[in-house]
Each structure stands twice: as structure tokens, then as C-alpha cells.
Amino acid sequence: MNWCFIVFSSFATANRVKSLLLKNHGIKSTIMQTPGEIKLKSCSYCLKINLLHLDTAWDMVVRSGLSSKGVFSAEGFNKIR
């Protein structure tokens, strides 16, 4: 299964998105500390989601006006959004 990480600066924001994804779209995700392979200037939390749900999840983040540090592939940790 292909995974990706949507990175947020706070646990609260990640948790809000996780709840909205499950409630509004039935999409399950996992909150975790951002892997060290993703080089960011500060610590952060991310949602690990199936890549198949990325468009739905990203649209929800944008429409909600929430701030994200980006989306990274779980394979290679490349920034994809």
C-alpha cells in the first residue's frame, strides 16, 4: 500500500484534520511525529494516510483554511505538495 504524510506544525491541527477526515469522508489516518527523514526547521506532527485519499484530504485541509507544511511521500520522503 502506498502512503503519504500530511505535515502540520501542531498536534491539535493534525488531530482536527484526522477527526474531519473520519467524520466527513470515512477516511482513517494515523497521527505520528514527523519522520526524521523529512527535514523541517522545527518539530511537527503528521497524518499518515493512504495515497489514494490524498486529493480528498488535501482539498479538505485547503478548504478548512488550515496550515500545512506540505505532503511527503512515505517512499523516499520527497515533497509532493
Which residues make up each language-model segment?
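Structural motif
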Residues: C4-F5, T30, K69-G70
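Amphipathic, hydrophobic secondary-structure cores in small proteins
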Residues: A12, K28-L51
